[in-house]
Swiss-Prot record:
The entry's keywords: Cleavage on pair of basic residues, Cytokine, Disulfide bond, Glycoprotein, Hormone, Secreted, Signal
Annotated function: Hormone produced in response to various stresses to confer information about those stresses to the brain, and trigger an aversive response, characterized by nausea and/or loss of appetite. The aversive response is both required to reduce continuing exposure to those stresses at the time of exposure and to promote avoidance behavior in the future. Acts by binding to its receptor, GFRAL, activating GFRAL-expressing neurons localized in the area postrema and nucleus tractus solitarius of the brainstem.
Gene: GDF15
Entry protein name: Growth/differentiation factor 15
Swiss-Prot/TrEMBL GO biological process terms: GDF15-GFRAL signaling pathway; negative regulation of appetite; negative regulation of growth hormone receptor signaling pathway; negative regulation of multicellular organism growth; positive regulation of phosphatidylinositol 3-kinase/protein kinase B signal transduction; reduction of food intake in response to dietary excess
Source organism (scientific name): Macaca fascicularis (Crab-eating macaque)
Disulphide bridges: C203-C210, C211-C274, C240-C305, C244-C307
Length: 308
Protein backbone atom coordinates (compact mmCIF):
# COMPACT_ATOMS: atom_id res chain seq x y z
CA UNK A 1 0.00 0.00 0.00
CA UNK A 2 1.29 3.55 -0.71
CA UNK A 3 0.37 4.64 2.78
CA UNK A 4 2.42 1.81 4.31
CA UNK A 5 5.48 2.77 2.24
CA UNK A 6 5.24 6.36 3.46
CA UNK A 7 5.34 5.24 7.08
CA UNK A 8 8.75 3.57 6.58
CA UNK A 9 10.49 6.83 5.60
CA UNK A 10 13.11 7.90 8.14
CA UNK A 11 13.90 11.47 9.18
CA UNK A 12 16.52 12.06 6.46
CA UNK A 13 14.19 10.78 3.73
CA UNK A 14 11.33 12.95 4.94
CA UNK A 15 13.68 15.97 4.94
CA UNK A 16 14.67 15.21 1.33
CA UNK A 17 10.98 15.03 0.35
CA UNK A 18 10.36 18.42 2.00
CA UNK A 19 13.33 19.98 0.20
CA UNK A 20 12.10 18.69 -3.18
CA UNK A 21 8.58 19.98 -2.55
CA UNK A 22 9.65 23.41 -1.27
CA UNK A 23 12.63 24.07 -3.56
CA UNK A 24 11.91 27.13 -5.78
CA UNK A 25 11.82 26.53 -9.57
CA UNK A 26 15.03 27.29 -11.45
CA UNK A 27 15.14 30.40 -13.61
CA UNK A 28 13.06 33.55 -13.41
CA UNK A 29 12.56 35.83 -10.44
CA UNK A 30 12.55 34.26 -7.01
CA UNK A 31 9.43 34.67 -4.87
CA UNK A 32 10.28 36.40 -1.58
CA UNK A 33 7.03 35.14 -0.08
CA UNK A 34 8.04 31.53 -0.81
CA UNK A 35 11.47 32.13 0.69
CA UNK A 36 9.90 33.49 3.89
CA UNK A 37 7.77 30.36 4.31
CA UNK A 38 10.68 27.91 4.17
CA UNK A 39 11.00 26.38 7.64
CA UNK A 40 11.97 22.90 8.77
CA UNK A 41 11.61 21.17 12.14
CA UNK A 42 14.94 20.11 13.63
CA UNK A 43 15.56 16.34 14.04
CA UNK A 44 16.90 15.08 17.33
CA UNK A 45 19.77 13.13 15.79
CA UNK A 46 22.99 15.21 15.61
CA UNK A 47 24.05 13.75 12.25
CA UNK A 48 20.66 14.55 10.73
CA UNK A 49 20.88 18.07 12.17
CA UNK A 50 24.25 18.67 10.47
CA UNK A 51 22.98 17.27 7.19
CA UNK A 52 19.84 19.39 7.36
CA UNK A 53 21.87 22.54 8.05
CA UNK A 54 24.12 21.85 5.04
CA UNK A 55 21.05 21.50 2.84
CA UNK A 56 19.61 24.73 4.23
CA UNK A 57 22.92 26.47 3.66
CA UNK A 58 22.91 25.35 0.00
CA UNK A 59 19.38 26.70 -0.34
CA UNK A 60 20.42 29.97 1.22
CA UNK A 61 23.32 30.38 -1.24
CA UNK A 62 21.08 29.52 -4.19
CA UNK A 63 18.44 32.03 -3.09
CA UNK A 64 21.07 34.71 -2.51
CA UNK A 65 22.57 34.14 -5.97
CA UNK A 66 19.18 34.48 -7.64
CA UNK A 67 18.33 37.61 -5.68
CA UNK A 68 21.61 39.16 -6.81
CA UNK A 69 20.88 38.15 -10.41
CA UNK A 70 17.47 39.81 -10.18
CA UNK A 71 19.07 42.93 -8.75
CA UNK A 72 21.70 43.05 -11.51
CA UNK A 73 18.95 42.86 -14.12
CA UNK A 74 17.08 45.73 -12.46
CA UNK A 75 20.23 47.85 -12.28
CA UNK A 76 20.88 47.34 -15.99
CA UNK A 77 17.26 48.14 -16.94
CA UNK A 78 16.59 51.35 -15.02
CA UNK A 79 14.29 52.62 -17.78
CA UNK A 80 12.03 49.60 -17.24
CA UNK A 81 12.09 49.16 -13.45
CA UNK A 82 12.34 52.12 -11.10
CA UNK A 83 12.78 52.09 -7.36
CA UNK A 84 9.61 52.77 -5.37
CA UNK A 85 9.13 56.28 -4.06
CA UNK A 86 8.53 56.61 -0.33
CA UNK A 87 5.91 58.93 1.13
CA UNK A 88 5.45 59.32 4.89
CA UNK A 89 1.87 60.00 6.08
CA UNK A 90 0.59 60.67 9.60
CA UNK A 91 -2.79 58.94 9.97
CA UNK A 92 -5.13 59.42 12.90
CA UNK A 93 -5.15 56.36 15.18
CA UNK A 94 -7.48 55.28 17.96
CA UNK A 95 -8.27 52.11 19.91
CA UNK A 96 -11.64 50.57 19.14
CA UNK A 97 -13.68 47.78 20.66
CA UNK A 98 -11.70 44.66 21.42
CA UNK A 99 -8.46 46.62 21.29
CA UNK A 100 -8.48 46.89 17.50
CA UNK A 101 -6.63 49.79 15.87
CA UNK A 102 -8.59 52.18 13.67
CA UNK A 103 -6.62 54.25 11.17
CA UNK A 104 -8.08 57.28 9.42
CA UNK A 105 -6.16 58.51 6.35
CA UNK A 106 -7.32 61.79 4.87
CA UNK A 107 -7.57 61.75 1.08
CA UNK A 108 -6.13 65.26 1.06
CA UNK A 109 -2.70 63.92 2.10
CA UNK A 110 -2.59 61.01 -0.36
CA UNK A 111 0.17 61.33 -2.98
CA UNK A 112 -0.61 62.35 -6.54
CA UNK A 113 -1.75 59.40 -8.65
CA UNK A 114 -3.79 57.68 -5.94
CA UNK A 115 -6.27 56.08 -5.65
CA UNK A 116 -4.50 53.59 -7.91
CA UNK A 117 -4.15 50.52 -5.72
CA UNK A 118 -1.62 49.02 -8.12
CA UNK A 119 0.80 51.89 -7.36
CA UNK A 120 1.12 50.76 -3.74
CA UNK A 121 4.22 48.57 -3.63
CA UNK A 122 4.20 48.34 0.16
CA UNK A 123 2.61 50.15 3.11
CA UNK A 124 4.25 49.97 6.54
CA UNK A 125 2.61 51.35 9.69
CA UNK A 126 4.46 52.34 12.88
CA UNK A 127 2.92 53.63 16.10
CA UNK A 128 5.77 56.13 16.37
CA UNK A 129 8.87 57.09 14.34
CA UNK A 130 11.09 55.31 16.88
CA UNK A 131 9.01 52.12 17.16
CA UNK A 132 11.10 48.99 16.63
CA UNK A 133 8.29 47.12 14.87
CA UNK A 134 6.29 47.97 11.78
CA UNK A 135 3.08 46.40 10.52
CA UNK A 136 2.51 45.59 6.87
CA UNK A 137 -0.87 47.09 5.93
CA UNK A 138 -0.44 46.81 2.15
CA UNK A 139 -3.41 44.51 1.54
CA UNK A 140 -6.04 46.37 3.59
CA UNK A 141 -4.92 49.72 2.16
CA UNK A 142 -5.11 48.43 -1.42
CA UNK A 143 -8.57 47.05 -0.68
CA UNK A 144 -9.74 50.40 0.69
CA UNK A 145 -8.40 52.23 -2.37
CA UNK A 146 -10.33 49.87 -4.63
CA UNK A 147 -13.61 49.82 -2.69
CA UNK A 148 -13.94 53.23 -1.01
CA UNK A 149 -16.17 55.83 -2.65
CA UNK A 150 -14.11 58.45 -4.53
CA UNK A 151 -16.00 61.27 -2.80
CA UNK A 152 -15.27 59.89 0.69
CA UNK A 153 -13.04 62.36 2.58
CA UNK A 154 -10.90 59.64 4.19
CA UNK A 155 -9.90 55.99 4.10
CA UNK A 156 -10.50 53.82 7.18
CA UNK A 157 -8.43 50.76 8.11
CA UNK A 158 -9.24 48.36 10.95
CA UNK A 159 -6.20 46.45 12.24
CA UNK A 160 -5.76 43.68 14.77
CA UNK A 161 -4.95 44.71 18.37
CA UNK A 162 -1.37 45.80 19.19
CA UNK A 163 0.76 42.84 20.30
CA UNK A 164 1.86 44.36 23.60
CA UNK A 165 0.33 46.43 26.38
CA UNK A 166 3.03 49.08 25.93
CA UNK A 167 1.89 49.57 22.33
CA UNK A 168 -1.70 49.98 23.50
CA UNK A 169 -0.58 52.63 25.98
CA UNK A 170 1.36 54.37 23.20
CA UNK A 171 -1.81 54.67 21.11
CA UNK A 172 -3.56 56.42 24.01
CA UNK A 173 -0.57 58.64 24.75
CA UNK A 174 -0.48 62.22 23.51
CA UNK A 175 3.14 61.67 22.45
CA UNK A 176 2.15 59.05 19.88
CA UNK A 177 3.11 60.13 16.37
CA UNK A 178 1.99 57.30 14.08
CA UNK A 179 3.56 57.01 10.65
CA UNK A 180 2.43 55.27 7.47
CA UNK A 181 5.23 54.77 4.93
CA UNK A 182 3.91 54.31 1.39
CA UNK A 183 6.32 52.72 -1.08
CA UNK A 184 4.94 53.73 -4.49
CA UNK A 185 5.71 52.38 -7.93
CA UNK A 186 6.48 55.44 -10.09
CA UNK A 187 5.08 55.81 -13.58
CA UNK A 188 7.59 54.75 -16.23
CA UNK A 189 8.12 58.16 -17.85
CA UNK A 190 8.42 59.90 -14.50
CA UNK A 191 10.81 57.21 -13.32
CA UNK A 192 13.14 57.82 -16.26
CA UNK A 193 13.18 61.54 -15.54
CA UNK A 194 14.00 60.87 -11.87
CA UNK A 195 16.80 58.46 -12.86
CA UNK A 196 18.39 61.06 -15.13
CA UNK A 197 18.06 63.69 -12.40
CA UNK A 198 19.77 61.39 -9.88
CA UNK A 199 22.67 60.82 -12.28
CA UNK A 200 23.20 64.59 -12.39
CA UNK A 201 23.24 65.09 -8.60
CA UNK A 202 26.02 67.38 -7.49
CA UNK A 203 26.48 68.17 -3.80
CA UNK A 204 26.80 71.94 -3.28
CA UNK A 205 28.51 71.34 0.09
CA UNK A 206 31.37 69.35 -1.38
CA UNK A 207 32.03 65.69 -2.26
CA UNK A 208 30.75 63.17 0.26
CA UNK A 209 28.85 65.64 2.44
CA UNK A 210 25.31 65.43 1.01
CA UNK A 211 22.69 62.70 1.37
CA UNK A 212 24.21 59.49 0.04
CA UNK A 213 24.52 55.74 0.49
CA UNK A 214 27.09 54.62 3.07
CA UNK A 215 28.29 51.09 3.90
CA UNK A 216 29.31 49.88 7.36
CA UNK A 217 30.85 46.45 8.01
CA UNK A 218 29.19 44.83 11.05
CA UNK A 219 29.20 41.45 12.78
CA UNK A 220 26.18 39.72 14.26
CA UNK A 221 27.48 40.72 17.69
CA UNK A 222 27.60 44.37 16.62
CA UNK A 223 23.97 44.17 15.52
CA UNK A 224 22.80 42.24 18.59
CA UNK A 225 21.68 39.33 16.38
CA UNK A 226 24.12 36.65 17.53
CA UNK A 227 21.49 34.84 19.62
CA UNK A 228 18.99 34.30 16.78
CA UNK A 229 20.81 34.60 13.41
CA UNK A 230 23.05 31.76 12.18
CA UNK A 231 24.20 33.17 8.84
CA UNK A 232 25.65 35.37 7.47
CA UNK A 233 28.04 36.04 10.34
CA UNK A 234 28.99 39.46 8.95
CA UNK A 235 26.87 42.03 7.13
CA UNK A 236 27.66 44.96 4.85
CA UNK A 237 25.00 47.35 6.17
CA UNK A 238 24.04 50.06 3.69
CA UNK A 239 22.45 53.17 5.16
CA UNK A 240 21.67 56.77 4.25
CA UNK A 241 23.75 59.58 5.74
CA UNK A 242 24.62 63.17 4.92
CA UNK A 243 23.09 66.63 4.77
CA UNK A 244 20.07 67.68 2.73
CA UNK A 245 20.77 71.10 1.19
CA UNK A 246 18.10 72.92 -0.79
CA UNK A 247 16.87 71.14 -3.94
CA UNK A 248 19.08 68.11 -3.38
CA UNK A 249 17.31 64.76 -3.84
CA UNK A 250 14.03 66.10 -2.49
CA UNK A 251 11.51 63.28 -2.28
CA UNK A 252 8.40 65.44 -2.67
CA UNK A 253 6.94 68.93 -2.41
CA UNK A 254 6.71 68.59 1.36
CA UNK A 255 10.51 68.32 1.54
CA UNK A 256 10.81 71.55 -0.47
CA UNK A 257 8.39 73.36 1.84
CA UNK A 258 10.19 71.98 4.89
CA UNK A 259 13.53 73.30 3.63
CA UNK A 260 12.09 76.75 2.90
CA UNK A 261 10.56 76.96 6.38
CA UNK A 262 13.76 75.67 7.97
CA UNK A 263 15.68 78.57 6.46
CA UNK A 264 13.14 81.01 7.90
CA UNK A 265 12.58 79.31 11.27
CA UNK A 266 15.54 77.00 12.00
CA UNK A 267 14.64 76.79 15.70
CA UNK A 268 11.16 75.38 15.10
CA UNK A 269 11.35 73.59 11.72
CA UNK A 270 14.04 70.92 11.27
CA UNK A 271 15.83 70.43 7.98
CA UNK A 272 14.85 67.49 5.73
CA UNK A 273 16.49 64.20 6.67
CA UNK A 274 18.39 61.72 4.52
CA UNK A 275 16.41 58.44 4.46
CA UNK A 276 16.19 55.32 2.24
CA UNK A 277 14.16 55.70 -0.95
CA UNK A 278 14.34 51.98 -1.75
CA UNK A 279 15.82 48.80 -0.33
CA UNK A 280 17.78 45.69 -1.31
CA UNK A 281 16.53 42.33 0.02
CA UNK A 282 18.60 40.35 2.51
CA UNK A 283 18.33 36.64 3.34
CA UNK A 284 19.06 35.34 6.85
CA UNK A 285 19.32 31.82 8.25
CA UNK A 286 17.74 32.24 11.66
CA UNK A 287 16.76 30.16 14.65
CA UNK A 288 13.10 29.39 15.28
CA UNK A 289 11.14 27.54 17.96
CA UNK A 290 11.10 24.45 15.72
CA UNK A 291 14.63 24.57 14.28
CA UNK A 292 16.01 26.96 11.67
CA UNK A 293 14.49 28.75 8.70
CA UNK A 294 15.26 31.01 5.76
CA UNK A 295 13.83 34.51 6.08
CA UNK A 296 13.97 37.30 3.50
CA UNK A 297 13.87 40.92 4.72
CA UNK A 298 13.14 43.44 1.98
CA UNK A 299 13.39 46.66 4.03
CA UNK A 300 16.70 46.12 5.83
CA UNK A 301 19.47 47.35 3.49
CA UNK A 302 19.16 50.77 1.87
CA UNK A 303 19.56 50.83 -1.91
CA UNK A 304 19.00 54.50 -2.69
CA UNK A 305 18.58 57.68 -0.63
CA UNK A 306 16.57 60.89 -0.77
CA UNK A 307 15.63 63.80 1.49
CA UNK A 308 12.30 63.87 3.33
Amino acid sequence: MPGQELKTLNGSQMLLVLLVLLWPPHGGAVSLAEASRASFPGPSDLHSEDSRFRELRKRYEDLLTRLRANQSWEDSNTDLIQAPEVRILTPEVRLGSGGHLHLRISRAVLPEGLPEACRIHRALFRLSPTASRSRDVTRPLRRQLRLARPQAPALHLRLSPPPSQSDQLLVKSSSSRPQLALHLRPRASRGRRRARARNGDRCPLGPGRCCRLHTVHASLEDLGWADWVLSPREVQVTMCIGACPSQFREANMHAQIKMNLHRLKPDTVPAPCCVPASYNPMVLIQKTDTGVSLQTYDDLLAKDCHCV
